């Protein structure tokens, strides 16, 4: 995660805008309820700042990335990819460091057994192809760059999701608070001149950061999380507001990643949310990462 730059604006202009933007969720909002909380900080190989998250349906495991652990000498064991059971137990810890030590987010392409990975230091999206072992984060992985996000104005790409039906990558930029939708052109390759790119902003809905994004399976609505706001923003693919899902009172400190996966309570689908807690730039010794399993209550 890139350090936050301080900006000073006249207070007389800032207060009315902030009041309007950061007000409570509207009447049509839903709220989240906790199903389970896991302390990623107490794993045998800890994840102090879990950031990215996706679900691997083939192994029925969550994959979680930590982009900050390499900055903590006391905790860094060369592992920044964590394979996790849905109940929160660590199955194994692996590494993506041969192509990134800053894996901000993950998105699964199960059909092609590939993992998309964002890096907000290099401003790239990588595609990591599993080798013969079928596993991610092992020696036989083959990783290539598929997007240089600066090409379309994203200098802080943090969130990522893959829509197989639309063959679309969606990137959330934490600094611009914009959601970028990228589709391949006629050459059927990402990162070339004929890519079709669209975007919309989230600041108008009260977000001051946009950490991650995931798409619903049937409606293709987008769920977006912020490390500073205590709600999940749901929009249409074009950016129209659907609702805000209130997270107040759940104990989430800094939402960093979001994905769907089967619930531990028998539900076909629950939200899994990573919480990076206190920023290691503020407290270099922090180790307070958590994983939330949530249900949405209308």
Where are these regions (language model features)?
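Compositionally biased, low-complexity segments enriched in small residues
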Residues: 1-2, 36
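Bacterial N-terminal signal peptides that target proteins for export
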Residues: 2-13
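Sequence/structural signature of beta-propeller domains
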Residues: 28-298
